[in-house]
Amino acid sequence: MNNMYFSLLFLLFVLCSSCDISNPDTNSKPYPIVDIDGNGYDSVQIGNQFWLNSNFKVTHFRNGDPIPEAKTALEWIEASEQGKPAYCYYDNNPFNALLYGKLYNWYAITDPRGLAPLGWHIPTDEELIQLGNDVNNDGGSIKSNSGWQNGANGTNTSRFYALPGGFRSYNGSFSFIEYFGYWWSSSASNNENAWGRYLNSEGNYVYRYMYKKGCGFAIRCIKDS
């Protein structure tokens, strides 16, 4: 009788141990997040927001249509002048995308076909303002702790891993890799410009500025609320 009793207790223990009876966390991080090309991303919570903690690398819109790649300065300029989406690699070198992701003009990130995975979107200017507030505008806390020139590496205490991937001007030229990092918001400031953010190797501040929509910046995605 005692053997049967202890056997039943053991079985009950095993069954209970295999069940997760804790309350579900509605803000839990979905690992990994996968874009339409199969690239995987991790996320990090900063304040009440969830962010991808690496730059985007996708080459297709969410419906499967390819994002046009601008392989020459002329192609980049034409996309800018015509208000058409485009992406590129820094210096037209695919190797740079392995670390820094790809550079997109603003027309690509606001195209109605969508870039972000389902449940995610390109941040608005207001959401980037909130990110800055959440880290007290301390750029060092969102900078990666390696890769920045002039001894300007960050602490990365937020685990955002902001990297100095440089940018592409609307005129097709590339600048500032290893010295500056630039990210788009989805918010236009006027007909020609849109809001973005940059970090640099000369200080630890989150800078807000408006840029020509034809410029090529990195993008991060934020989770839908």
Protein language model regions, located:
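C-terminal motif of bacterial Sec signal peptides marking the signal peptidase cleavage site
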Residues: 15-18
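Sec-dependent signal peptide recognition
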Residues: 2-10
